[in-house]
Amino acid sequence: MKGVKAEDVHHFLLNTEDLRHRRVSRMVEEVQKILLQVTSDISNRDSRFHCISNAGIHSDSLKVLSPSQFLVTVPLRGLSGFRQKKTRRWRYYSPSGTQLLAPAMEPEKLHQWLEIEQFQKSTPHWHDNDVNIKGDLVPARIIHVFLEHLYRAITFCSLSDKVNVLESYGPSIRLNVETSEQMVEVELVPVVEVPGYWPKKSQWPRFFKRWPLRERVQCVKSFGFDLLARSNYHWQLSFLRGERLLLEAMDDDGGCRMKCYRAVRQMKEDVWCPGNHPVINSQHLQMIFLWASERHPSAKAWKDLGRCFLRIVRRLQKCARQRFLRHYFVRRANLLKYADTAQLDALADKLSRFLQNPSLGQGASSVC
């Protein structure tokens, strides 16, 4: 197998990275400005929803999944003092509130039920029937309430020419937001923030692992986790703040992990997995890098940029071929469980051909 020289990766990043950063930063700034208006109006109408922060590309409320796909979380207010407790096992209601003869589906590995009693403090509106069924906070109902406010806010803020709500087949809110660069698809997700608490579903860190350091682990856990409203009944566990903290400190030992990550991401976006709805996004890549950092904890393993680049490409190919990628914090969850298998197979084939004759020239030429 041919190799890739470190200077080739450096040259590739020099020709592509700055352009991408400037484009994405402009789009993030414009999207945040628009959504700040919209969510501020929603917050004024319904105090249960907080407006998003406007902190640029490093905002905790916005994640760039790809240049054409953003994830924006909308914090929920009036819920505090979360505690883990054993919830009742079966639910016999639909999201609309009608009685079912058979119980609703149990949560998957990365999901859980959420009861109002799990919070030591909750404002009276969270007990209302528009979001609560038999003591459960129901994501589908919260999304429905938020969506109604969203339509009114877009009209009130005179943003109908900039923002278009997309038709959705599940409990999610997706928008097309027009920017000066291109149209961006934004998923708006209500989120319950749980700072200072670590969920039992996350058996992390694993025993006898040298990465990350104990101090970093304690810092990550102090940020807690989030619960995202992305399904009918269940709340999805999310660790975006912890992931960001680990990524930011990844090269404190002088390694080349983040340069390697940016090179793989650029090739993925330009050559291996282009388009508006890539089967692999930045969230998947970050998981791959977190696992690789745990498996190769020494600084020596991350000195040769060319070798590290190919190591990650091989790992990405393996994930695509096997259609399996463990979540870093909840390792029993497969992040590719519902991914398009045809797209994963096509990606694996592209990566196989690339590894037979690796060249970064194709990625650089597609950007120019």
UniProtKB/Swiss-Prot annotation:
Pfam family, one: Mab-21_C
Highest taxon listed in the record's lineage: Eukaryota
Similarity remark: Belongs to the mab-21 family.
Protein name (Swiss-Prot/TrEMBL): Protein mab-21-like 3
Natural source organism: Xenopus laevis
